[in-house]
Amino acid sequence: MLFNSVDFLIFFPIVTLIYFLIPHKIRYIWLLVCSYYFYMCWNAQYALLLFASTFITWLSGIAIDNAAKKEEGTDRTRSKGIVAISLVLNLTLLFFFKYANFTIENLNALLADTGVTIRVPKLDLLLPVGISFYIFQALSYTIDVYRGDVQVERNLLRYMVFVSFFPQLVAGPIERSSRLLGQFYEKHRFSFDRMVQGLMLMLWGYFQKMVVADRLSVLVDQVFNYSSYYQGFTILIGALFFAVQVYCDFAGYSTIAVGAAQIMGFDLMENFHQPYFATSVADFWRRWHISLSTWFRDYLYIPLGGNRNGKWAKYRNIMIVFLTSGLWHGANWTYVIWGGLNGLYQVIGAQTKKLRAGCRRLFGVRENTGSGRLLATVITFLLVAFSWIFFRAATLEDALTVIRQLFSSFNPWVLFDGTLYTLGLSMVDFWIGVLAILTIFAVDLLHEKNVRIRQWVLEQNWMFRWVLYFVALFVILIFGFYGPNYDAAQFIYFQF
């Protein structure tokens, strides 16, 4: 069941209505039933995997809490052992379903290179939707209980709804128990203002997904799937469009999730904060997929030592985090290269800080001026967009083909001679896409300037507000892309 499906538009109002009608004491049970139904709409069997990860981490939390009461002083051997078992079991589940065939493919390639004729057969597995998201959310609970950051949850059903809460189950945000778990104890009363604010968020998310991301995907697919036929600026447009597509696709999902949860009285974390207005790659990763970035910061980067042991240890830790992040995104070397490239950008950025400051002085560019920030933002966007080539390409060979074709010709005339209208989008759809992109960046710019758009809308008279809401709805219905290549299942981050 996808957010941009008719099924969800029927499912969500029914769930919300019943949620507010039934007694507070059983609301979390209702949410649990609905969340598991939501997940089982993809594949009912994989609900067992969701439950397995949930039960392991719930039981681990209780065992850690019990062990902590018996441990003396700083000796936490038993608790550490329980955490280790929880990590191993959950990561084994993740490895088996997500990385087993990737490992087999690479093993077979290695055997072939060494002349061995034996081949390991691949497993007949489908990747469970959202497995990386809910396993990371569940693991954070185990670790937080061990650290003493949260109290143990002994109610299994309430913990199950924390892990499986349907708005953020399959593509985040990856919530922490310290933020979300306690909200299932709160007595949420229906709030008309919260409903309106949540609906505004959902409309904006649907605009990002259906008007922008789905439209751009047609041109992007054409360019990347047949990259050997295109050159220069045609490839450049495809790469830049993908940078916007992946942002609007994922941010759109997160925005819908936050809005849906808000309607029911729950507050989920912000997952994107104007990432394409970042002035460095490090700044970009403080703004992009914030729930995952902070997860890796708190549970991998800092435990590795963070920046405490000198710059080279810091650089090593950055590379470990981003290589791991790349692998988290997918079982493909393209994702590993993408992650490594983003880590390398940051290492090079830190190492060349003085050199770049000297260059700015030489050319009279001040870092904190508007022109200085604009230059840094454009450079950061281009670096990130280049790395997205590896993220989008099906194989390393395809990625290298795209890069080779990108620099193979200087042909700016394709921007004006109609070539861009032969890439799957008509001239009208192409320019609707461009206007939609400008709208996305204009809204992000206002947010960057601390303009609270939703608050401003709520301060207007009721007639203006509701006209605006219906205009937004009709824009999505009229300009949402429903062409021959449209597939409601194509939320990019569902594959992770």
Where are these regions (language model features)?
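Membrane-embedded transmembrane alpha-helical bundles that form the catalytic cores
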Residues: 1-495
